[in-house]
Amino acid sequence: MRRLFSLILLMICTMPVWADNLDQLYKAAGWPDQRAHFNDALTAAQERYRNSLPPAVYQALVNNSNQRFQAQAVDRRAQAQLRATLANPAPALAFFQSPLGRKVVAAELKATRKDELAKNAKGLPKIQASDDRLLVIGHLAQALPAREAGAEVSLAIAGVAADSLSSMIPGLFGGGQAQGLLDGQRQRLMGQIGEDLNNTLLYVYRDLSDAELEEFATFAESPDGKAYYQAALAAVRAGLAVGQSTNDLK
């Protein structure tokens, strides 16, 4: 009985520390900033529909997508999933708080800024690299869930009009049929992202030295790195909630 009491006491004392680690990890890994960059892209997508839709339909689209991707709600869903999926956040937190981790996050945030996206709207420049650097990038391409996360972001932005129409005209997109179309789009986007993924990673992490890039790949391929990136992908999916009705989101 004493051992059980001690175990429960230890769990009570440890849980707030782990929760605090998760909050710190969420910020250190750049999640709030990336969500802000996503909202910038969402606003740009809304503007593209302004002149092609009737005013009432356009306003419904804006209202619906703003509700769906409300910042606090996206953060809440993503953080809850990260908390549920990542058993021990300490190793990932240590990495992202390190000088290299901060440099990785800075590179990723720079790549998703709206001015960078506008500059590269017609495609990224072809990056030349040594065979050794290409080898490390290949390892990173396998370790990072870039295809999957990129597909979710693309689907979320592209789906604002369809989601709004579905809310205005219930039953417009049948459940099973809609899910089948969504899965097909997801696979197609993952394939498209994968075709140029190595060059994309070379561009994003171009300011990392060869040694830093290798250290990053070592973390990403480690058990702790794999655990974090698997949890991160689940958190992206939970935060964006592609395929879920806006009315069903919490």
PLM features: residue spans?
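Sec-dependent signal peptide recognition
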Residues: 2-7
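N-terminal signal peptide c-region/cleavage motif recognized by signal peptidases
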Residues: 13-17
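N-terminal Sec/ER secretory leader and immediately downstream segment
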Residues: 19-116
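Surface-exposed patches in mature extracellular/periplasmic domains of secreted proteins
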Residues: 37-38, 89-94, 104-107, 151-154, ...
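Membrane-interacting alpha-helical segments
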Residues: 58-75, 172-198, 240-244, 250
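Extended amphipathic alpha-helical interaction segments
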Residues: 112-206
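A cross-kingdom marker for long, charged
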Residues: 187-191, 195-250
